[in-house]
Swiss-Prot record:
Protein name: Nucleoside diphosphate kinase
Cofactor: Mg(2+)
Catalysis: reaction(s): a 2'-deoxyribonucleoside 5'-diphosphate + ATP = a 2'-deoxyribonucleoside 5'-triphosphate + ADP; a ribonucleoside 5'-diphosphate + ATP = a ribonucleoside 5'-triphosphate + ADP
Amino-acid positions noted as binding ATP in the UniProt annotation, renumbered to this chain: 9, 85, 91, 102, 112
Listed GO MF terms: ATP binding; metal ion binding; nucleoside diphosphate kinase activity
Record family assignment: Belongs to the NDK family.
Amino acid sequence: MERTFIMIKPDAIKRRLISRIIQRFEEKGLYLAASKCVIPKREVLETHYSHLSSMPFFSEMVEDMMSGMVLAMVWVGKDAVSIGRKLIGETNPQAASVGTIRGDYGVSTGKNIIHGSDCVENAEKEIKLWIGDDVQPVSFFDKEWIY
């Protein structure tokens, strides 16, 4: 089974959207394998978003992400990365389809509620960065029913 990294950002936590977001992943048949609530450190954010470091909004984004808790999660299931991306929607909530997390709850590109890995390789890097190596294997007792 494939793993993906999903992070609920401070704007969603401040708006009390955690349960609504988690419900969408569970309803799609993904399993929550690990989670961690943390106020992110600058170093972790700079590593996570290193591909955006030359962008003019980078410093403001890092400061905003440090403004409150994030919920870092590992979700497991068949095609977990692509399912996660479809559930999340476009980066810009204004362009995201209604029915996606960002389309329904996002306010702006800077307040877009959630992060999701874009490929399996990045998912594994992000899981290691945010959660570490302590993710236990998931028992799929209902695998045949879901898949």
